[in-house]
Every structure is written in structure tokens, then in C-alpha cells.
């Protein structure tokens, strides 16, 4: 491969060949140059339609932007187009990352995060010597570069971001792909480069270059993309560190190198680790390879050593298509982490990025490479992995074009797509280098690669800057400490005056800052109807009131400082009142919007406003006197009225003035009125704010409803656009049918397919309609509720049965417990005998004998109680002993069960061993029989030969060996017979497959020839159509000229000169005209008759072509 790119550079043309005359400027081979006369557009194939919109005023040049939109915009529209207007292309949704996180000053504009497309670069390798010898020097290549970003293969054009022809060098590829990748990584974006193509197309050479170029001490021109990228990366890191040395900028880089061989991951830096597993990090939602070696790198030499080590361990084999064919996908990954610190606020910035350099194994056909054995197995795994990658790219391109998200994207179908899922449609910028071969033998693989690249161009990634900010804990602690000190200082100076009688400077600065913030933040409220400030209840305990204290001292600085403070304060408040008055007169004030937007003239106010919380206010007589207090005194006393605007105006007229001395009672009354007015204003403001929140909630609900409607309209627009496209294709087919190009059978088949597509679209539109979806959701909810009710009904019956069963059990237990609680018969009899005591009257009659009877009864009760206690103890001990026996029996039963299971398992094992031994015994018996038979045969032969004595023992031993060898040979013969049958079956299957492939190849050749013939016929028909259109235009032009001439003659012949001088008619006779006038009239009518006949013949003759054209239009 090195010889291809190095030896052919001198012989390759310096500039690409000019495009053919039928090729468009930038659209590929299918677009024809539009002429000045009107003709119909030729429709492009679907696979080469650029989904990107035409450039707008916001488009800018980017390395990841496809120029196809601009080239298609430059094509002029046709003069006549009888079809429907074309469907507008789908717009790419670009994520503007640069606005959220600006790039450094030195970063170029091309590497910004505003473009989320995929950069696709096609590189055409020079033809090899073998290809030149086989195809001949004069034979043309299959692929040709027609422009800076377009190629053509067999009349079919493709448009990409860049196209590198045979004369391109490694430096050109680096400038196209490598340099933007380095800038993106330094800006914090993840970046990836894929090298895709068939085997032997130059992917490995483009990515790594030859190993000799890596090991050379001098800089070689054949170095690949990877060493050039890291050389620029380390130089840019040094520049950034020198440029931002004040920010303590530090970079850390570590690299890993792996390969995917037969769907198994191997660490190329440590080849002992094989079959590594891919794990997913739940915290960061990213994937990684477990136990993969990562080496820290600091210079380009470290990276070169890793590349040499990894590429030496990579699996490469020789095939007929390539002497060193890569048999695995390899991925070289570099993790870059930068840390910087902002010295102003102490915050730390951490920016991470990742570079993935992927060299995919080349797709190959067994027919061309003649692979067999391990090579065939490797080729099957490679083609399967690339097929899954192509399927994934098709799905991602479909999602990007349609804008509809899919529930499942098959990232896990292969190790390659699972490992690189972040680069495919995720948080990364992707560039793809598609290497193709110009040989005619590889035209199908080249076309497949170009189609793959064109589909990959439609993918949209969401690349964002990976940056985190962490505030310094020490700086935050210092700020908290300073704020606490300021708060403590404000509290101490706010309650006690200074030693010299002047107010605290820190308190004044803090107060002025808060006043500035409150005046510089206007608050706008919505329009409120029927507003009344008297409906809100105000708690007087939560309102701050000015204290009424006597002033016993004045400022020590005298009246000069007091007057200066007064003037500053009066000027600042006067300016604020002017701003408020202007807001009052404006529309915003009429809408009950309150706002204050002004600034104080002097930030260092030295006169405080005395405010004391009502909850901690004490008696003014008991408090200490304060100096130079200020009070809110109205300059004009407001009148009590219910008008809210009047109260607001009265509150605006309030002024802050200084008071040297005690405040009189009239002023206190005025202050109370002012505060009541302020309370009412605040109550109205609070109520308006609540109403504004309610209105905001309503508007948010309306916005959600409008968003749903917008989504519905978007879906309907897409469906309508698809239906319009189908109708346009139908019109085109009808035109081709009328022109005689398309047969009726093909038209009917195409109509059937289009109607099926339209039916699917309408069905999808119906299913995705919001009302239908809501109805479905409601139906599912009702069905679930009905199912729940049914289950509840079934459960109710079951529960009723269980309740009845439990009632029966309870009744049984109660009856049994009552039976158990009955005393034994002996105790009952004893109790009955005891209970048969004499009555009191009998005891009185008995006298002394009654006392003896009572004593005997008591003794019997005591003995009976003792007997019952003993019986109870015996029953308890008996129950405990029985319980222990039950537990022991349970343990014994469990042990017996375990022993029985073990015995059963042992018996099963013994049976299996017995069966195996029996089989072995049978085989040994058969072998022994064969050996004995052989021995008997040998003995018989020896007896016939007359052998006696010791020779017979030797013969017996030989006979045993011969019989053993016979048995082994019989086994081998049977094994090889089975193997032969299997191989014959495989051979027959392979022959059938080859025959089927041959038939398929013949059919494909026939189809290609038919397609080429149809294409030629279509071109001829289109040329004839253009000629017919030109003839139509010429005839129309001639017809217009003839009509103009006739109109001129009509205008000249309507008023002859001799008609004007006719004599007056007589009174008795009829009016007569001279012969000259009548002759002239008849003359121009006779002259006009042939033109009228010609025009009628033109318009009414069915055999004329113009009549058929009008009929076609109708």
C-alpha cells in the first residue's frame, strides 16, 4: 500500500479531469445542465438527495458542514415545470454549544460546536501495478472526481464534504480532518475518526502510515494521520500552557490501544489480556473496556512507541487482494484532561475530551480473495460487524431526517457499535474517511462504500463541551467570613452611634448598595381589573414604624456637612421621583406596573434612616437619645380618598428630609397616614403579584397546549409533504406513460406500491393524531379499570369463601377450647362433693358440730387445691416434654429426608457408573472376542504349518497384536467413512450454492444490461423531448409573429381613405357607397380568409402534433 501512494504521486494528474458535459456543477452525474429553454427536471435518485437545507443567512463555513446545499442552490430553476413544487428539505437541528460555553481566544471558528453533522471525506487510492497490467494502461477508472466535493461512478454522482483523488498526500488528509480534530479536542469536544472501505483500499496507510515511517528519526512524508495529529496536539498544548500561564493550565493525556478480532476484544498494549468485556458506567452513562491498559503520554515519542507496539501485535495476514490485510478492527483512544484555575474568584475548571481513531477492517468478497479456513471465518466476522454498523447508520440517518425518536437503537448488536456508541449519534464530533479503489474489478465495492458514506453524512450528533466548574472552598469560606464580619459590624453600628456622633460608614455603604439594587430592578405587573387596595388585611405587628425619639445632640461637623448630605440625598431622591413620575405617565404605569429604575448620585450617604421593628420597640422615654435621625415626612399632606391612583400619587410625593430635633405630633399623624397609604399600596402589589402568578400558570398551560398543536401540525405537514411527493411521482409516471417511456404494467405496479405507501402514511397519520392517541390512552385506562373491577369481583368471591372458612375454623376452635377447659370427672365429683355443704340453718342447729363440719370442708378445699396445682404442673411438664419430642421428631425427619436425597443421588450416580461400566464391558467383550478369533485363526494357520513349542507363544503374541490392530483400523475406517460422508454433503451444498450464485450473477448481469438499455432509452427520449420542446417554442414564436402581422393588416384595412370622401345619400333613395370602398372591404376580407383557414386547420387537425400536445395538457 505504501508503494501505491508513494510511486503514483508523480504519475497522477495534478488536477482532476474536467467533468463530462452532461454533469452538473455540483450535483453529481445525474443532473443535466439546464438550457435557456424550458424543460422538465430530471429526478435524482433517492440515495443522493442532500437532506441539509439550502444555506441561509446564518450559515458559516465549517469543517463539518456539507457543501451540497450551496451547490444545489446554485442550479437555476427550469423555465417550465408542470409538476408540483418540490418538497422542502428537512432542516438539521444544530446545537449551539458556543453560546453556552465560549471557546478560547485562540480556537478557530471552524471547530466550534455549532455544527452537529458528520464530516465525510472520500479518498481514491492510485491503481496498483497489477491492476494496471490486468486492465491495461488505456482503460478508464471506475470512479472519477468531478469537483472539490463530488465524485461520479458509472454516471451516478455523489456529493461529500471533500474528495481526495490519486494525487492527494498524507498532509492533505491531515489538513482536512486532523487539524479540526485537534482544535475540537482542545475546546472540550469528543472527536472520532473512522476509516472505512474495502480491503486493500488504503485505510491502514491513511490512519497509521507504514511502520518504517514511525520508526524513522527523521520526519517522513508518508506518516499517517495519527502521528501528525498527536504532533500538532502536543505543540498546541505547549502554546496553550504558555498563553494561559496565569491560570495554572495543566494537561494530562493517557492512551489505550485495542483490537476487535472475531468479536473478541484484545489489548494490543498487553496481548495476554484477551476476551475483555465492555462495561457501562451508570453514573456517567458511558461505556468502557474492563482491565484495559492505559499509558500516560507526554511527548510524540511516547505515542510513537505505543503505536509501534500495538501495530506489531495487531493481526494481519496475506490475501490475494492485499499482502498485509488487517483482520481486525483496531481503536486507538486518547483521553485528554485539562485543569485551570481562575485567580480572581478561585474557581477551578476541568475540561475533558476523548479522541477515537478507528481503523476498520476491510470488507471483502470470497470470490475475489479466495479466502478459506481461518481467513474465511475472519472475513465472515468482519462482514457481519460492518453490516451491523451499516444497519445502525441507516437507522441513525433515518432518525435524523425524520426527526422522530425510536424506542430502540441496536447499539449492542456488535462489540464495535457498542464500544463506539458515543461517536455514532452521541456526544462527539465524527469524521469519516472512506477509502475507495479506482479499479473496474472493484466497482461494486466502491459503489457500496460511496452509498455507505452518503448515508453516514445524514447522521446528526449532539456534541457538547465537557467542562466542569468547581469553586474553591477556601475562597468561599473567606467570603462567608467577610460577610459575617460585615453583618456583625452593621448590627453593632445600627443600634449604637459612633463615638464621634457620626453614623457608620459600613452601614451607609451597605444601605446605599441595597437602595441601588432596589432602584435598578424594575418590577412589571400585568393588567388587573377591578383592583382595590382595601381588600387585603395587613398585620400591624409586621410593619416597621419610625421611632419617636428626642434628639439631644447634633452633628459635630456642623451645618456644612449636614447641608451637603441634605443636598446629595435630595438630589438622588428627586431623580428617583422624576423616574417614577415618568413611569406613572407611561402605559406601563397605567397598567398598574410599579417600577423604580434609577441610581443614587452619591454612593456614600452619611445620613441613616431610623427604623425600629415594632416587635422589639421599647418606650421612647426609656431608650437612649439618638442623634440626627431621619423620618418619612410628606411634603404635601394627602387627602383621605378611596381612589387607588390618588393614594399611589400621594405615596410618590413622599420625601426623605432630615430633622434636627424632636418630631411634633402633627408629623406623627402625617407619618401614620403615610404608612397606611403604603400598606394599601403594598397590599395591592401583593394581590397583583398573586394574580400575575395565576395568569402565568394559565399562560404556561396554554403554551403546553400550543406546543402539542405545533407537534400535531408538524406531523400533519410531514405526512402531507410525503403525500405530495407521492402525488408528484404519480404525475411523473403518468407523463412518462403518455410519452411512451414507461409500460403500462410497470405503471400499475408502481401505482400499487405508491398507494400502499400512501395508505401507510395515512394510517400512521391517523394513529399518531393527538386526539386518537388521547382516545387510545383513555380506552386503555378504562379497560384497566374494568379489569381491576373484574379482579375485585373475583377476589370478593374468594374473600367471602375465605371468611366463611375462617368462621368455621373459629367455631371449631372455640368448641374444642371449651371441651379442653372442662375439668376431669374426678375433679368435678370432688367439687360437687365439696359444694354439697350444709346450709347456714343446719349449721346453727348443729351448734358445735357445725364448726367441725366447716373445718372439714376447708381442709377438703385446701387439699383439692393442692391436688389441682400438682395436676397442673404435671400437665405443663408433659406438654413441654411432648413439644420437645415433636421438635426432635421434626429434626429427625429432616435429617432422614436429607439422607434419603443423598442416598437417591448416590444411587443415581451408581446407576450411571454401572451403565458406563456395562457399556465399557460390552465393548471390551467384543474386542476380546475379535482378539480371540484372531488368535484362533493364527493358531489354526500355525497348526497347519506345523509350529510347535516356544514358537507358538510368539505366534500367540503376534496374533493378539494383529487382532488389536485390526480393531483399531476398523474404528478408523468407520470414522473416516463418516467424515467422508460429511465432506461430500458439504461439497454438494457448496456446489449448489456456487450454482445458485452463478445464476444470480447471470441475472444481475442481465438486470444491469437491461438497466443500461433503459437508461439509454430514457436519455434518447429526453433528447427527443427537448427537441420537441424547442420545435414547440419555435412554432409558437412564428405563430405569434403571424398574429402580429395579421393584426397590423386588420388595423390598416378597417378605414380606407376613399371611404371617408363618399357623397351624401339622397333623401328618397337608400344609402349607397362608391365602388372603391366596397372593393377594398371585399379585398381585405379575401386576404384574411387563407389565414383564418390556416389557423383553423392548425387548431382542429387531429393529426397535427400541436393537437396532441394540447390534449396531453388537458
UniProtKB/Swiss-Prot annotation:
The keyword Ribosomal protein does not apply. One of its GO terms (molecular function) is microtubule binding. Keywords: ATP-binding, Coiled coil, Microtubule, Motor protein, Nucleotide-binding. One of its GO terms (cellular component) is cytoplasm. InterPro entries: KIF15/KIN-12 (IPR044986), Kinesin_motor_CS (IPR019821), Kinesin_motor_dom (IPR001752), Kinesin_motor_dom_sf (IPR036961), P-loop_NTPase (IPR027417). Residues 117-459 form the Kinesin motor domain. Residues 1055-1065 have a biased composition (Polar residues). Residues 772-810, 999-1043 form a coiled coil. The keyword Cell membrane does not apply. Residues 98-107 have a biased composition (Low complexity). Belongs to the TRAFAC class myosin-kinesin ATPase superfamily. Kinesin family. KIN-12 subfamily. This is Kinesin-like protein KIN-12B. The gene is KIN12B.
Amino acid at each position: 500500500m505504501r508503494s501505491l501512494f508513494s510511486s503514483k504521486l508523480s504519475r497522477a494528474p495534478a488536477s482532476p479531469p474536467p467533468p463530462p458535459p452532461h454533469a452538473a456543477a455540483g450535483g453529481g452525474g445525474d443532473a443535466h445542465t439546464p438550457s435557456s429553454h424550458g424543460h422538465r427536471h430530471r429526478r435524482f435518485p433517492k440515495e443522493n438527495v442532500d437532506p441539509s437545507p439550502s444555506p441561509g443567512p446564518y450559515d458559516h463555513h465549517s469543517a463539518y458542514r456539507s457543501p451540497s446545499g450551496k451547490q444545489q442552490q446554485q442550479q437555476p430553476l427550469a423555465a417550465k415545470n408542470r409538476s408540483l413544487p418540490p418538497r422542502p428539505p428537512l432542516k438539521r437541528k444544530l446545537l449551539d454549544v458556543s453560546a453556552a460555553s465560549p471557546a478560547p481566544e485562540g480556537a478557530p471558528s471552524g471547530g466550534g460546536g455549532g455544527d452537529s453533522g458528520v464530516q465525510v471525506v472520500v479518498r481514491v487510492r492510485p491503481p496498483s501495478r497489477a491492476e494496471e497490467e490486468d486492465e491495461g494502461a488505456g482503460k478508464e477508472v471506475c470512479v472519477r472526481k468531478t469537483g472539490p466535493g463530488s465524485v461520479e461512478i458509472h454516471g451516478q454522482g455523489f456529493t461529500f464534504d471533500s474528495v481526495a483523488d490519486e494525487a492527494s498526500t498524507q498532509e492533505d488528509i491531515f489538513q482536512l480532518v486532523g487539524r479540526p480534530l485537534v482544535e475540537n479536542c482542545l475546546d472540550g469536544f469528543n472527536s472520532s475518526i473512522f476509516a472505512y472501505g474495502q480491503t486493500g483500499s488504503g485505510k491502514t496507510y491513511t490512519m497509521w502510515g507504514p511502520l518504517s515511517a514511525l520508526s524513522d528519526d527523521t520526519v517522513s512524508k508518508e506518516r499517517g494521520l495519527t502521528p501528525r495529529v498527536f504532533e500538532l496536539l502536543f505543540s498546541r498544548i505547549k502554546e496553550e500552557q504558555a498563553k494561559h500561564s496565569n491560570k495554572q493550565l495543566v494537561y494530562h493525556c493517557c492512551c489505550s490501544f485495542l483490537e476487535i478480532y472475531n468479536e473478541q476484544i484484545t489489548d494490543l498494549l498487553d496481548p495476554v489480556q484477551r476476551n475483555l468485556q465492555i462495561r457501562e458506567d451508570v453514573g456517567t452513562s458511558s461505556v468502557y473496556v474492563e482491565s484495559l491498559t492505559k499509558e500516560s503520554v507526554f511527548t510524540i515519542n511516547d505515542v510513537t512507541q505505543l503505536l509501534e507496539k500495538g501495530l506489531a501485535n495487531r493481526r494481519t495476514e496475506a490475501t490475494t487482494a492485499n499482502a498485509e490485510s488487517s483482520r481486525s478492527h483496531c481503536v486507538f483512544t486518547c483521553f485528554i484532561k485539562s485543569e485551570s484555575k481562575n485567580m480572581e474568584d478561585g474557581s477551578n475548571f476541568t475540561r475533558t475530551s476523548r479522541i477515537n481513531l478507528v481503523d476498520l477492517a476491510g470488507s471483502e468478497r470470497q470470490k475475489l480473495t479466495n479466502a478459506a479456513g481461518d481467513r474465511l471465518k475472519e472475513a465472515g466476522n468482519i462482514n457481519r460487524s460492518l453490516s451491523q454498523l451499516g444497519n445502525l447508520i441507516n437507522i441513525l440517518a433515518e432518525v435524523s431526517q425524520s426527526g422522530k425518536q425510536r424506542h430502540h437503537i441496536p447499539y449492542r448488536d456488535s462489540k464495535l457499535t457498542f464500544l463506539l456508541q458515543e461517536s455514532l449519534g452521541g456526544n462527539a464530533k465524527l469524521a469519516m474517511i472512506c477509502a475507495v479503489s479506482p479499479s473496474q474489478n472493484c466497482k461494486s465495492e466502491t459503489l457500496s462504500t460511496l452509498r455507505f458514506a452518503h448515508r453516514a453524512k445524514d447522521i446528526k450528533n449532539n456534541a457538547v463541551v465537557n467542562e466542569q466548574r468547581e469553586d474553591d472552598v477556601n475562597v468561599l469560606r473567606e467570603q462567608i467570613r467577610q460577610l459575617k464580619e460585615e453583618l456583625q459590624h452593621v448590627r453593632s453600628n445600627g443600634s449604637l452611634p459612633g463615638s464621634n456622633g457620626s453614623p457608620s460608614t459600613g452601614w451607609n455603604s451597605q444601605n446605599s448598595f441595597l437602595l441601588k439594587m432596589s432602584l435598578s430592578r424594575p418590577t412589571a405587573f400585568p393588567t388587573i381589573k377591578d383592583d382595590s387596595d382595601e381588600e387585603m388585611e395587613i398585620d400591624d405587628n409586621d410593619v416597621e414604624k419610625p421611632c419617636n425619639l428626642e434628639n439631644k445632640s447634633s452633628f459635630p461637623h456642623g451645618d456644612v456637612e449636614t447641608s451637603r448630605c441634605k443636598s446629595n440625598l435630595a438630589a438622588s431622591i428627586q431623580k428617583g421621583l422624576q423616574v417614577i413620575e415618568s413611569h406613572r405617565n407611561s402605559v406601563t404605569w397605567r397598567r398598574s406596573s410599579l417600577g423604580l429604575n434609577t441610581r443614587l448620585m452619591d454612593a456614600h450617604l452619611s445620613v441613616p434612616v431610623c427604623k425600629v421593628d415594632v416587635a422589639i420597640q421599647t418606650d421612647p422615654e426609656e431608650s437612649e437619645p439618638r442623634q440626627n435621625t431621619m423620618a418619612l415626612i410628606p411634603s404635601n399632606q394627602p387627602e383621605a380618598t378611596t381612589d387607588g391612583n390618588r393614594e399611589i400619587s400621594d405615596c410618590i410625593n413622599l420625601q426623605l428630609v432630615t430633622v434636627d430635633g424632636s418630631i411634633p405630633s402633627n408629623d406623627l399623624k402625617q407619618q401614620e397616614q403615610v404608612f397606611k397609604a403604603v400598606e394599601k399600596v403594598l397590599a395591592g402589589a401583593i394581590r397583583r403579584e398573586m394574580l400575575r402568578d395565576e395568569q402565568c400558570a394559565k399562560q404556561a398551560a396554554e403554551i403546553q397546549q400550543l406546543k402539542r398543536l405545533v407537534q400535531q401540525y408538524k406531523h400533519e405537514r410531514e405526512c402531507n409533504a410525503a403525500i405530495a411527493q407521492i402525488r408528484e411521482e404519480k404525475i411523473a409516471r403518468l407523463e412518462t406513460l403518455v410519452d411512451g417511456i414507461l409500460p403500462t404494467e410497470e405503471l400499475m405496479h408502481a401505482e400499487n406500491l405508491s398507494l400502499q405507501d400512501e395508505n401507510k402514511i395515512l394510517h400512521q397519520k391517523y394513529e399518531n393524531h393527538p386526539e386518537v392517541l388521547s382516545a387510545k390512552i383513555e380506552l386503555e385506562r378504562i379497560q384497566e379499570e374494568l379489569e381491576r373491577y373484574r379482579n375485585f369481583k373475583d377476589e370478593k368471591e374468594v374473600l367471602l369463601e375465605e371468611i366463611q372458612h375462617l368462621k368455621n375454623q373459629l367455631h371449631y376452635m372455640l368448641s374444642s377450647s371449651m371441651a379442653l377447659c372442662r375439668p376431669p370427672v374426678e375433679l368435678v365429683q370432688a367439687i360437687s362433693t365439696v359444694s354439697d355443704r350444709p346450709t347456714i340453718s343446719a349449721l346453727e342447729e348443729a351448734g358445735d358440730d357445725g364448726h367441725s363440719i366447716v373445718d372439714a370442708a376447708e381442709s377438703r378445699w385446701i387439699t383439692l387445691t393442692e391436688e389441682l396445682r400438682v395436676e397442673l404442673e404435671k400437665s405443663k411438664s408433659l406438654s413441654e416434654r411432648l413439644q420437645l419430642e415433636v421438635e426432635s421428631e421434626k429434626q429427625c425427619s429432616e435429617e432422614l429426608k436429607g439422607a434419603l436425597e443423598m442416598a437417591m443421588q448416590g444411587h443415581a450416580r451408581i446407576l450411571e457408573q454401572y451403565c458406563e461400566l456395562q457399556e465399557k464391558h460390552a465393548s471390551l467383550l467384543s474386542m476380546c472376542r475379535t482378539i480371540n478369533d484372531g488368535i484362533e485363526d493364527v493358531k489354526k494357520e500355525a497348526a497347519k504349518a506345523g509350529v510347535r513349542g516356544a514358537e507358538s507363544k510368539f505366534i500367540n503374541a503376534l496374533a493378539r497384536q494383529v487382532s488389536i490392530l485390526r480393531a483399531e483400523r476398523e474404528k478408523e475406517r468407520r470414522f473416516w467413512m463418516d467424515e467422508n460422508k460429511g465432506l461430500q454433503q458439504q461439497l454438494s451444498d457448496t456446489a449448489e450454492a456456487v450454482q445458485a450464485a452463478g445464476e444470480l450473477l447471470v441475472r444481475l448481469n442481465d438486470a444491469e444490461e437491461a438497466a443500461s438499455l433503459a437508461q439509454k432509452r430514457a436519455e434518447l427520449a429526453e433528447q427527443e423531448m427537448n427537441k420537441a420542446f424547442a420545435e414547440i417554442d419555435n412554432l409558437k414564436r412564428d405563430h405569434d409573429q403571424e398574429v402580429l402581422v395579421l393584426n397590423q393588416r386588420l388595423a390598416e384595412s378597417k378605414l380606407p381613405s376613399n371611404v371617408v370622401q363618399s357623397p351624401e345619400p339622397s333623401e328618397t333613395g337608400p344609402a349607397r357607397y362608391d365602388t372603391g370602398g366596397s372593393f377594398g372591404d371585399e379585398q381585405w376580407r379575401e386576404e384574411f380568409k387563407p389565414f383564418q383557414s390556416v389557423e383553423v386547420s392548425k387548431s382542429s387537425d387531429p393529426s397535427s402534433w400541436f393537437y396532441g400536445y394540447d390534449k396531453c395538457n388537458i
